């Protein structure tokens, strides 16, 4: 990963290797090191008051990830604090800011009215894949599916939960929190989300009709 040298000021060269190793756990399809690299590449051209702090938060924001768990962000924030305090010349204020950024990724819009400018930046970068090309989005959607099914949900559970999440996103006044994020990604994100909802509901409808037909056939056999 090539980043501006000032983003690594005061940090041991092995800091990134330590973070990268955490992303090598089994079962990851989307929340991988490639996701981090993609976010960091977008940060290079994204307005930010403290890009070094946003960068360090991005590096650790999905370091701990188990599908279905609700404490991934807290565990990732703890790992970030422990690693950075040991391997970087970094202040307590900066560590607190990094922790808040990582914890904010737990629910991207729940705290939207209380976020700092750079907390909004990291959230937009984290979701920027939503506004990618259709091919990029299709790969993302498949990767999310493969992380959850069957590790944390059945196919039907995933489709229902995913559709609900996407509908909530589409109902928001803005998918992205910053003016720059909205300018770059809001319109394509809405088109991609609407496409995925159509795909999910069509397949869910087919599955429900198929199950209903099987049940009717079984009932006829019993009678």
In which residue ranges do the predicted regions lie?
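Amphipathic alpha-helical interaction segments
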Residues: 46, 65-70, 87, 109
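Active-site metal-coordination segments of metallo-dependent hydrolases
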Residues: 25-38, 65-78
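Divalent metal-dependent phosphate-bond-processing catalytic cores, especially two-metal-ion Mg2+/Mn2+ enzymes
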Residues: 2-3, 24-31, 41-50, 60, ...
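Histidine- and acidic-residue-rich, metal-dependent catalytic cores
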Residues: 22, 76-111, 167
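Short, well-structured alpha-helical segments
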Residues: 13-20, 33, 37, 55, ...
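His-Asp-centered metal-binding catalytic motifs of divalent-metal-dependent phosphohydrolases/nucleases
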Residues: 39, 51-67, 76, 98-106
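Alpha-helix N-cap and coil->helix boundary residues
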Residues: 14, 49-50, 71, 75, ...
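Hydrophobic, proline/glycine-rich low-complexity stretches
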Residues: 1-17
